[in-house]
């Protein structure tokens, strides 16, 4: 087998990043969290107070941005921003930033370049199976009901020392979902080839096991 590309898409809080990290550790494959790339770019635009409504200013700013994914860490202009990109302000604005054509074009070019260089790759995001790796060997769409997704987000925030009421998180997720599903460029959608996996009642390990089984079914004929 020459390589394997696994594309995992789904809404915020479905468990994509955690599942992909565990899969990466188990399989020894590279994992690229494209959401982290969008958050890193959002962080840059916020910190530098770039007027995103001004296309000329935005395009000029994007030429100064270098994003590198290395050892499950995200570097923005050579600075490790893996923790900084997880703050509430970035999370709140990333969906708006991600809808900008110039931003998507820059990161799509970077993501496609990564796909060509890494033979065994797990990539997760919103449009991986539909746009970034349309020829992926296996496509999965992870989802969960909004209450479960909100509870996961709340737990994630607690670990970062942030308290947030569950109803506020649910409202935030609803807004994020609407933006992701309705943006004009590369909206969140399930590829016709993607297998739907509802994680509402599943543990992370159970999801990982199911995906491993799917990978084994795909690869076993190649190994005979």
Curated annotation (Swiss-Prot):
InterPro entries recorded: Cytidylate_kin (IPR003136), Cytidylate_kinase_dom (IPR011994), P-loop_NTPase (IPR027417)
GO CC annotation, single: cytosol
Cellular location(s): Cytoplasm
Residues holding ATP: 10-18
Keywords of the record: ATP-binding, Cytoplasm, Kinase, Nucleotide-binding, Transferase
Family membership noted in the UniProt record: Belongs to the cytidylate kinase family. Type 1 subfamily.
Source species of the chain: Phytoplasma australiense
NCBIfam families: cmk
GO molecular function list: ATP binding; CMP kinase activity; dCMP kinase activity
E.C. code: 2.7.4.25
Alphabetized Pfam families for the sequence: Cytidylate_kin
Name of the protein in its database record: Cytidylate kinase
Catalytic activity: CMP + ATP = CDP + ADP; dCMP + ATP = dCDP + ADP
CDD domains named in the record: CMPK
Predominant location: cytoplasm
Single GO BP term: pyrimidine nucleotide metabolic process
């Amino acid at each position: 087998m020459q390589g394997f590309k696994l594309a995992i898409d789904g809404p915020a809080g479905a468990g994509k990043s955690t599942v992909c990290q565990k899969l990466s550790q188990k399989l020894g494959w590279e994992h690229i969290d494209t959401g982290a790339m969008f958050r890193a770019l959002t962080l840059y635009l916020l910190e530098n107070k770039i007027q995103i409504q001004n296309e000329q200013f935005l395009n000029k700013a994007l030429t100064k941005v270098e994003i590198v994914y290395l050892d499950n860490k995200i570097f923005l202009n050579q600075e490790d921003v893996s923790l900084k990109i997880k703050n509430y302000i970035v999370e709140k604005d990333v969906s708006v930033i991600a809808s900008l054509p110039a931003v998507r074009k820059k990161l799509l070019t970077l993501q496609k370049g990564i796909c060509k260089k890494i033979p065994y790759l797990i990539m997760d995001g919103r449009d991986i199976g539909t746009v970034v790796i349309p020829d992926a060997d296996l496509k999965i769409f992870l989802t969960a009901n909004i209450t479960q997704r909100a509870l996961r987000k709340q737990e994630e925030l607690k670990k970062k020392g942030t308290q947030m009421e569950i109803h506020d998180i649910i409202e935030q997720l609803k807004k994020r979902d609407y933006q992701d599903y309705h943006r004009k460029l590369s909206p969140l959608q399930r590829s016709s080839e993607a297998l739907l996996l509802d994680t509402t009642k599943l543990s992370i390990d159970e999801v990982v096991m199911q995906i491993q089984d799917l990978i084994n079914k795909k690869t076993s004929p190649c190994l005979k």
